[in-house]
Amino acid sequence: MENIREVVERLPLLTDPHTEFVLLRSCLSLPKIMFMLRSVNTIDHQEPLLQFDSIIRGALSAILGSPLTDDQWCQASLPTAMGGLGLRCAVDHAPVAHAVSLIAAQPLLDGLLGEDVEEFSLPQPLLDTISAQIGEDTTVETLTGVSQKKAFRSKLFTGQHLTNSRGGGQ
């Protein structure tokens, strides 16, 4: 986390807010830790994700020259197609990223192990967390192909941003 903080703190050296923002969004925010989010179940490790999101929020505040309210941060973390700045929050995406990664890897694991699991299941705490985020029951079937499902992404963002459950004030 300290490495990320150090790099983000160097963004102002560029002296071009647009370049700083593009680097923040495209390289230093969620893309920086997406591999970890896909491969590690972070349900019991929310603090580092909150810390990461706080670093990104602080960097955006520095670029804009003003601290962000919780509502402004929620809007900034929406996808650009939904009127946001595309600075996705790690704490929001971690459970779904991990679940979808497990589902995508299952056929490969079955082939490598010579097994054919007819009913693949995800850990119940993971499903419960995702269900709480989107406001409805979640199953392996509803998550299959989720990266292509606009409706699911909409539910994820609507459930999180309209209720402003994340807060994270700074």
Residue positions per predicted region:
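Nucleic-acid-interacting cores, centered on viral/eukaryotic replication and modification enzymes
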Residues: 1-170
